Every structure is written in structure tokens, then in C-alpha cells.
Amino acid sequence: FGSLLGICLLTQILTGLLLATHYTADTTLAFSSVAHTCRNVQFGWLIRNLHANGASFFFICIYLHIGRGFYYGSYLNKETWNTGVILLLTLMATAFVGYALPWGQMSFWGATVITNLFSAIPYMGQTLVEWAWGGFXGDNPTLTRFFALHFLLPFIIASLTLIHLTFLHETGSNNPLGVQSNCDKIPFHPYLSSKDILGFMIMLLPLMTLAMFSPNLLGDPENFTPANPLVTPPHIKPEWYFLFAYAILRSIPNKLGGVLALAASVLILFLMPFLHKSKQRTMTFRPLSQLLYWTLVANLLILTWVGS
């Protein structure tokens, strides 16, 4: 899935650059500039739909990639694993600030609710939120800085990816048995290159299908309404890939507790290398660990479903 993530990043940066050329980061113009891109720009609708749904595929790939790393004990390559978790956090930040850009109802309220979580930090919380917003509510300064961040972060992701790969290159890749694979090395081309191209096709075909036939399947209809600070949508919820964390946040009555649990649900990944106590690296021959692993997967799916 690593190669798929690379292709995702490339696609997102390309479509994103094309979108940025037609986008205006101003509260009065942002919504109509996106509408203009979809209506009047050559293939603007396709570029926008590919960019929006590409994010979903990016998250599908990264969750599968992490799950695979979990199952086969890849977290024992500590540097690779830690840079990977940092990559995940950066990706989440990028997706969050990007979702605010069309400045629809859900964009505005999602941004408001999530940035508001910083106010749970004792003493300095409220000041921090107002500093992040650039005012007393999400407004023009908020949108412009979110656009700047959304433009910058993917390039940071790209550079972190290089670091991630450099660390991986130190140890070489892992395999389902968790044994040395030096004797199994084969030329990259034509073997692995064709495997990668097959993966690209298997991913890009559903992406194109989704973008062409039902581009709004995963989006929220609230976002077709321009942002209005005076009207709160009936149910504020993030895109599906954040629902598990959002469900954790909302299930805890205390604000600070919820924020800590939300952060912990992702940051727990940093602890994985220290929690490995088995003599075997992978879960291939560890039925009990497998049971716990699939329980975790089921939990995440249930949380995602409950969060919606």
C-alpha cells in the first residue's frame, strides 16, 4: 500500500495545484469560486471530484497500510514506524484544513468545532483558539491561513515520505513471516514495477468511477449551503475517515477528557514498538493476537458507523 499512498499523494498534489489556480481564499468568494471551478473551468468538475474523493482513497490506503504494519510487526523498524505516524498526523491535519476551504456550512462548522477543542487546554486554551482563528470566530483570517496551510502541508508530507523511505531502506522491507528476505531479492523491473502498476489500476479505477458516477456519495449535503455563522447545521460531523476519532470525542462527557481520548486514539501508535513482547515478529502464527487484532478492526468500523 506504500506505493498506492505515493500515487495518492501525487494525484492530490496535481489536482490540488490545478484547483488552487482557480480558488479564491476569501470568505465572500471561496464558495462561489469552487462553484465556478465546477461549472466553467475545463474539466473543473472532474478535477474537484478527483481531489475530494482522492482524499478518501488516501485514507483507505493509509489505514490499510497501518493495519498491515500492525499485523506483520513492521513497527519494530522504529524509525520507519515513527516517521509513518508523523505522516499520518500531517495527513489528518491537511485533510482537516482542506475541508474548510469550500466554506460551506459543514466546512465552517467543522472547522469551528474542531479548532474549539483547543480551548479545553487549561489556562491558555481560549487564547490559543482565538490566536488560531485570528479573531473571535472563524472568519476571513481563518480561511486564508487554512488555505496557506493546505497548500504547504502536502509538500511537507512529500519530504517526510522521503525520510520514511530512507529509514525503510536501512532495514529493507518486512514480510509475512518476519524473517530476513535478503535471499528473496528480485529486480524491481519488471517484477515489482508490474505489481505496482496493477495496484495503481485497482485503485485508480474505483476512484475514477466514484468521481464520475457518484462524486457526492461520501460528502455531506450541508456543504452545498454557503457558510452561515448564525445557523448551526442539525448534526455536525466530519468526513467518514475521521468518524472513529469523532465518536470517541463525543462519547466522553468531559471536554478535556474527550480531547485527550481523541488524541490518544492516534498517538497510541507511537507506543506500538514498546508494547511488542512476543518472540515472533508477525501475527501469522499467533491466534490470540489475531483475535485481538480483528477485534480492534471491528471496533474501529463500529466507531465509524456510530459516529455517523
From Swiss-Prot:
Record-linked Pfam families: Cytochrom_B_C (PF00032), Cytochrome_B (PF00033)
PROSITE patterns assigned to the protein according to its UniProt record, in alphabetical order: CYTB_CTER, CYTB_NTER
Primary location group: mitochondrion
Claim: Transport is one of the keywords in the record: yes
One Gene Ontology cellular component: mitochondrial inner membrane
Intracellular or extracellular location(s): Mitochondrion inner membrane
SUPFAM superfamilies the UniProt entry points to: a domain/subunit of cytochrome bc1 complex (Ubiquinol-cytochrome c reductase) (SSF81648), Transmembrane di-heme cytochromes (SSF81342)
Bilayer topology: Multi-pass membrane protein
Record-level GO BP terms: mitochondrial electron transport, ubiquinol to cytochrome c
Binding site for a ubiquinone: 169
Family designation: Belongs to the cytochrome b family.
Protein name according to UniProt: Cytochrome b
Self-association state and partner proteins as the record states: The cytochrome bc1 complex contains 11 subunits: 3 respiratory subunits (MT-CYB, CYC1 and UQCRFS1), 2 core proteins (UQCRC1 and UQCRC2) and 6 low-molecular weight proteins (UQCRH/QCR6, UQCRB/QCR7, UQCRQ/QCR8, UQCR10/QCR9, UQCR11/QCR10 and a cleavage product of UQCRFS1). This cytochrome bc1 complex then forms a dimer.
CDD domains: cytochrome_b_C (cd00290), Cytochrome_b_N (cd00284)
